[in-house]
Amino acid sequence: MDSRRRPSKPLLTSSGEVLHRKQASPVTDEDQIHRSPKASDALPLPLYLTNAVFFTLFFSVAYYLLHRWRDKIRNSTPLHVVTLSEIAAIVSLIASFIYLLGFFGIDFVQSFIARASHEAWDLDDATPDFLVDDSGCPPPCPIVRTPNLDRQVLATLSSEEDEEIINSVVQGKVPSYSLESKIGDCKRAAAIRREALQRTTRRSLQGLPLEGFDYESILGQCCEMPVGYVQIPVGIAGPLMLDGFEYSVPMATTEGCLIASTNRGCKAIHLSGGASSVLLRDGMTRAPVVRFSSAKRASELKFFLEDPENFDTLSMVFNRSSRFARLQGIQCAIAGKNVYVRFTCSTGDAMGMNMVSKGVQNVLDFLQTDFHDMDVIGISGNFCSDKKPAAVNWIEGRGKSVVCEAVINEEVVKKVLKTNIDALVELNMLKNLAGSAIAGALGGFNAHASNIVSAIFIATGQDPAQNIESSHCITMMEAINNGKDLHVSVTMPSIEVGTVGGGTQLASQSACLNLLGVKGSNKDSPGANSRLLATIVAGSVLAGELSLMSAIAAGQLVKSHMKYNRSSKDMSKVAC
């Protein structure tokens, strides 16, 4: 058995004082009388005699049964025919075996448990120890505990070992970001980091949930240094009738009236026969920036990349990055001696930023063969353009480019939307078109497309930051059939969504994708699930635009928000 022990360390109080351990004193007869009872005291014989009896019984009955087994084989007697004495011997053998296994087996298992607990502290001798320093010096600053401690964290952190790690994190001896790798338990690491943060900041995190989340699922993928998770309510709008199918659309939001308004738009579309959608483009982009010694040399690269005869070779090099990546086009822009190369490729059911970046890196490495003087400044030169409002996305598109339209009956406009067609058409022209132009909007020719896009993105595990370009939308309204019907459409050139990777693998977001029927990758037609999700986003935006514009035209916007978007709590009583 491994008998190594951790060195004794001085215990510290919360104020940094050292608590000295008492030295062991000899055991007297009085101590033996008042000692705690042991489990072996319940045996009728002393422990060593009990062990001797069972050892003797085990080997004697084993010898007897083996002798009887040999006699039966010689006499051709069936082995299953047993006498009363043989039955007693079998029972004695089993009983003695169980006793010996229980007595010696527990000690054997405990030896491995003790060894594992000791070796866990010896994994990396080069890193700072979790234990408090032997010097007994007080920490550089006193640890002040907040009176309002988080009860759920205290319930999780119950061992002295956790307390030692917390003190090490607070004192800066152990980096907070390394807790997962050192401890090996993501939930425990989050609880320790959370408690250390509360002690450092002297602020309570009570109200931020810790329990009920799989912290293993976000390790190395979604979030670093977690201390909990934020709860956002998820509501359902719909059913949305789109391309002949009904969809219940999950929306995660804290804005009252948003889901109710979108739901009203879905109802108006459903009563009018549904909406239809068209996918115009499907291609993610990445644009590195490279530099040459002269503008002439930079133009040579531009001509080489845009030459159709070179596309097949470049495509073959690019597509090595993934079995789903397929290069669609290359667009170059020059600024002096710098070249911005915008690659566009399909990415299957993934949103595709990592996939296209790997393909771009393959092409850059390939180009170094013929362009030795090419200096790669960055894998992204903002000509992509990611997470920023940009004209290139508005004009050329990025991700999925979708158009969604519907024809709303005049009766539905009056009864459900509580307005009329002429008022909607006029408001759309003056607000969404002329008003946005006066404001100098870039892709913002709509009422509130980003509201719906953000809510669906959060619910389905998309990148919320890509709401910027994904919300590019122009809303059009026109009276048709002699003014009896309303034609409404939304054109969204850069919806960036995926159904695999990133936050889509989290349990809650995965459930919302499953509700829409687009969970995971489509095995039969790669990319079909992400394309369907993009059309659902556009259809939901269409419903939201229709309802909000109707509320504004009817003068109901302020009234509805006062009813659904105001808290009834007295905010003056909420503690800071």
UniProtKB/Swiss-Prot annotation:
Coiled coil: none
Localisation per UniProt entry: Endoplasmic reticulum membrane; Plastid, Chloroplast membrane; Peroxisome membrane
Annotated keywords: Chloroplast, Endoplasmic reticulum, Glycoprotein, Isoprene biosynthesis, Membrane, NADP, Oxidoreductase, Peroxisome, Plastid, Transmembrane, Transmembrane helix
Tissue: Expressed in trichomes, leaves, flowers, roots and stems.
Transmembrane segments: 42-62, 89-109, 532-552
Name of the top EC class for this enzyme: oxidoreductase
Reactions mediated catalytically: (R)-mevalonate + 2 NADP(+) + CoA = (3S)-3-hydroxy-3-methylglutaryl-CoA + 2 NADPH + 2 H(+)
Name this protein carries in UniProt: 3-hydroxy-3-methylglutaryl coenzyme A reductase 1
Organism name: Cannabis sativa
